[in-house]
Amino acid sequence: MARAGGRAGRVGVVTDSTACLPAELVAGCAPDAASLLRVAPLNVTIGDVTRPEDELGADAVASAQAEGIAVTTSRPSPAAFVEAYRALADAGCTSIVSLHASQALSSTVSSARLASLEAGLDVEVVDSRTLGMALGFGVLAALRWSQAGYDVDAVAEAARATCASSRTAFYVDSLEPLRRGGRIGRAGALFGSALSIKPLLQVDDGVIAPLARVRSRGKAVERLGTWALAQAENLGEGERVCAVHSLQHSELAQVLVDRLGGGASPGAGRDGEARSAEASSTGSSGGTGDDATGPARPGSRAAGPRADGAPGAAGPDAADQVGDVAALGAPSPDGTRGDGARAAAEADAASSSAVRWAMAPVQARLGAVVTAHVGAGALGAVVAVMPEPPG
């Protein structure tokens, strides 16, 4: 059933493999959702061999990086998107929302836009201004709204609102892969170069930017947990969702999942039960304005701080983490100060009211392309809020 207003018809969804989206989440988000989704894989080149990401996994990328072999990536061709669009048209879709990694990080959006001119049906291409499960949650929101019978405009806006609400932060062993790939400049690379300091980064308005510095992976887990709970408390109305990304550090990822799931209270999912997924991802591996026209739109961009914004309530054990993260406020070797005061304020703001997740925190494996750019040792946390379709 098409809702009033906008462009009617069955709406398909296309994304790319940087979403790192576990297949189990797609299958569980709405009845028959998988039939409405196509994933266009980016291409990975290891040495002189190029393969689509769904044919060359993240483990191969990690091995190549460990051996010092050059790894590069490239966008899907417009022809790959045309094929995906037409496959959905053959499945009965009359319009498509094509949701992709930030234009500032990848030219995938440009490829999708070129393909939309040849597809022969209505395609709305959306720059998510993010990547990873922040993009993946946008895809899940789009699938839910499509399955609820909403038109392409409402489906696209649900995806935009989810991605705009998202907050992504991650720890990396080294900034060198990001520097080589042009995702962070030389000045940014210096952020993690002094002594044994390890960088925490964030996706801020579509680009990768420094967030904090820690001295060990263990401290990174604690900092990411405090940060994620504080961000989730300020996301606004809707279903709060959370994901943890990793490849090589699965044990640390589980610690972070447990911290988020234990320091919070997983709420009931759409089927009345808390849900989680730990699996390889599909494909291998701006915000919206207010809309006063009624329930056919998912709502405005969620209020709340960006990753470096004002503190919010954190989990009940956050106060114990102050000593571990407060050292970030001490002068660093380059004379600047870290964000220890802010971290301590976040921890001190802990309250007895726990964050409630719409589903249990998801553990999502990094895909090959994301691994190529952040390194196999990356560990990330993503929080977002998904608007629920009315009715």
Provide a role label for each language-model segment.
Residues 1-2, 8, 78-82:
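M14 metallocarboxypeptidase catalytic domain recognition
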Residues 47-120:
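Class I S-adenosyl-L-methionine
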Residues 75-76, 127-129:
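Short beta->alpha junction loops
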Residues 3-12, 17-45, 108-124, 130-278, ...:
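Mixed-charge interfacial surface used for oligomerization/domain docking
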